Amino acid sequence: MARLVALDRVRNIGIMAHIDAGKTTTTERILYYTGRLHRMGEVHDGGATMDWMEQEKERGITITSAATTCFWTPKFGNYQGINHRINIIDTPGHVDFTVEVERSLRVLDGAVALFCAVGGVEPQSETVWRQANKYGVPRIAYINKMDRTGANFFDAVKSIRERLGANPVPLQIPIGEGEMFAGFVDLIRMKGIIYDKEDGSTYQEVEIPHDLQNEAKAWRINMLEAVSEHDDTLLEKYLNGEDITDEEVRKVLRQATLQVTIIPILCGSSFKNKGVQFMLDAVIEYLASPVDVPAVEGHHPRTEEPISRKPTDEEPFAALAFKIATDPFVGKLTFFRVYSGVLKAGSYVLNTITGKKERVGRVLQMHSNKREDIEAVYCGDIAAAVGLKDVKTGDTLCDENNPVVLEKMVFPEPVIQIAIEPKTKSDSDKLGMSLAKLAEEDPTFKVKTDEETGQTLIAGMGELHLEILVDRLRREFKVDANVGKPQVAYRETIRKSVEFEGKFVRQSGGKGQFGLVNLKVEPLEEGKGYEFVDAIKGGVIPREYIPAVNAGIQEAMKGGVVAGFPMQDVRVTLFDGKYHEVDSSEMAFKIAGSIGFKGAAKKADPVLLEPIMKVEVVTPEEYLGDVMGDLSSRRGHIEGMGQRAGAQFVAAKVPLSSMFGYSTDLRSMSQGRANYSMEFECYREVPRNIAESLQEKRTSKDAE
C-alpha cells in the first residue's frame, strides 16, 4: 500500500488550552468541517465525539487525549486547493491531567492554543504554554468565544504578550464583540468576512466596514512590521514603501512561526461556527509538517553512540509510544508517533527500553474511539498498534536491525495518595489487576502497598485525578472499592554533608557475612532526585558488589529517617570500604549500604518536606477579603493579585495539606461564584510543629 499523502502535506497538531476555553467544541467543529462528522456534538449535552469516556461526557471535561485524523483543503493562501492530512490530539485542560498534555506535546509538530476571549490567559494556559516551550512546539493562537458577553479580543492579545512573554501578531481583528460579533477583518488580504447569522459555515467576503478601516490599517502595519523583522528582503521593501505581496507575508510568517518567534493570532466562536475554517487554513499555512522538524535524536542502546533519524520513509523504522489505552474490544492499544521509516501490520518491532522483540498484530487509524484497520503506517503518522504486551509510555519502538533509543519522557511524581480497599471478596481478586492496568496507561498514577498496614495505596496528581481513576475502576473494570481520606505525599531530604561507615558483620560458625562501606552523603538541589557516585579505587570493594551497595542505599531511602517518608535530592558517594575473601556477598554489601546510608542521613540534618501548590482564585470583588483571609489561614503566602475579566484574582502558594476540601469551602464562601485552579509548584521544608506531630504519629504507629 503506497503512501496516501505526501509527507509535507501532513500536520500533527494538538489543541491546547485552559479547561473551559472550548477545546472539545473546537475539535468537534474541525471534524464537522473536514467531513469526519455528520452531526455536530456539543460538550454541554454530552454528545461530543472526542470525549469518549463516560466520565468525560458527564463532567464535560476531556481527560484522555483522543487521537483522530482528518483532511482539509485550504480555500486561501499559499497552499490553496491542496489537500492535506491533519492528525489531531485533543488534550485535557485540567491541571490534574498534565501528563496527558505533556506526552501529546512530545509527539506533535504544532499546536493551536485556544484562549477564551473573556478570560484571556488563565492559569492552566500558562502551564500548557510552558510545556509547549519545553518541546519547542510552534503555535498559532485562536481566541475563541468572541460571542460571549465581556469578550475582548485586544485584552486577550495583551494577556498573551504580558503573561506568556510571547510575541502575538494578530492576522485578524474582530468585527463586533459579544452578541455583536459578526466576523473579522483578514489583515493579510484586507477583506471583511461576515458570517451568516443562522448558518456559521456560510460567510460573505465584503469590504472592510467603514468604522473599522483605520483600525484595520493600523493592525496591518503592526503585522507587516513584526513580519519584516524576520526577513531582510521584506524589511528593505517595507522601509522603501514598496508593495509586499500576500504570498511573501505568509511565507515569512510561516518561517517565524516555525521558529516560535511569532504567534499568529486568529479569532472566532467555535460554538457559533465562526472562524474555524480560517483557523484550519492557518494550521496548514503556518504549522510544521514532519519535514520541517529537525531529525529526531537518539542513541544506540548498547554503545550510547548518538544516532539521528531523518523524517523519511526510507530511513529505518523508529517510533515513540506516547500513550497506552485499554480498549473494550481489542484490548491494549499502544498509540505511537512514527519519526522515520514504515511499519506494516503483522511485522516485528524491537522495544529498545525492554530489549524485547514484539509482533504488531494490527495497525489502527483512530478516529476518537472508532477505529479503522490500515495495512501500514508511514513516517510522520500517528497510529495505534494492537498486540504489543510489554510496551510502556515513552518506550522506543524500532527496526530490530537498526536499534535506537529516542529521548525518554520524564513525568512528575504524584503528590497525593489515598488508601483503597475492595468492597467484596470478588472485588479483591480483580482490584490488583485493574489498578495495574490503569497504572500502565498513566505514568503519574502509582500503586503501592504500605508495608506496615498492608493497605493498598494509590497516588496521583490531585483529588480529581484519583476520583476519576476510582470511578473508572467501577465503570470499566466493575470493581467496587472504598477509599480513605487523601494523604499528602511528604518527602525527606538532608541539609548537610556527612561521612559514615556502614558495617555488616555476622560470624557465628560456618560461612559468615561481611561488608563494610564508607559513604559520603550530601544534599542536591531540589528536583535532582538521587545520584550514586562510585569512587572506589584500587579494588578495595570488588566491582560485582557495588550495584548491591547502591540497591541497599535506595531501599533505605524509601523509608527515610525522620518520619518514614521517601528521601529525595541526595548524592551518595561510595569512596572506601573493605571486603572479606570468603564471607563477603552481595547481600552483606546491600545491608552495609543500607546501614551506612541510614546512619549518615540521621547525622546530616534530615528534614521533612511537603508539596507546595500554586493556587489561583478568581472571585467577585465582594468576596476578595474572605478569600485572602482564608488562604492565609491555610498557611498560604499571597504572591499577587489583580483584575481579570471583570473579577479579582489572587495568586498564592499554599501547602497541599491545607487544601483538601477547598472547593467546597470556596463554594460556600462565595455562594458558588468563585473558582480556582491548583498545580504542584515545589517541595518545601515543613514547619517544626507540623514535623513534630508527623513524627509523633510515626512513633505511635511503630509502638503499635
Curated annotation (Swiss-Prot):
Places the protein is found: Cytoplasm
SUPFAM superfamilies named among the record's database cross-references: EF-G C-terminal domain-like (SSF54980), P-loop containing nucleoside triphosphate hydrolases (SSF52540), Ribosomal protein S5 domain 2-like (SSF54211), Translation proteins (SSF50447)
Binding locations of GTP: 17-24, 90-94, 144-147
Cited Gene3D superfamilies: 3.30.230.10, 3.30.70.240, Elongation Factor G (Translational Gtpase), domain 3 (3.30.70.870), P-loop containing nucleotide triphosphate hydrolases (3.40.50.300), Translation factors (2.40.30.10)
Pfam family, one: EFG_III
Major subcellular site: cytoplasm
Keyword vocabulary terms for this entry: Cytoplasm, Elongation factor, GTP-binding, Nucleotide-binding, Protein biosynthesis
tr-type G domain residues: 8-291
Single GO term (MF): GTPase activity
GO-annotated cellular components: cytoplasm
Database matches in InterPro entries: EFG_II (IPR041095), EFG_III (IPR009022), EFG_III/V (IPR035647), EFG_IV (IPR047872), EFG_V (IPR035649), EFG_V-like (IPR000640), EFTu-like_2 (IPR004161), G_TR_CS (IPR031157)
Gene Ontology BP annotations: ribosome disassembly
Job of this protein: Catalyzes the GTP-dependent ribosomal translocation step during translation elongation. During this step, the ribosome changes from the pre-translocational (PRE) to the post-translocational (POST) state as the newly formed A-site-bound peptidyl-tRNA and P-site-bound deacylated tRNA move to the P and E sites, respectively. Catalyzes the coordinated movement of the two tRNA molecules, the mRNA and conformational changes in the ribosome.
Family: Belongs to the TRAFAC class translation factor GTPase superfamily. Classic translation factor GTPase family. EF-G/EF-2 subfamily.
Name of the protein in question: Elongation factor G
Species whose genome carries this gene: Chlorobium chlorochromatii (strain CaD3)
Lineage: Bacteria, Pseudomonadati, Chlorobiota, Chlorobiia, Chlorobiales
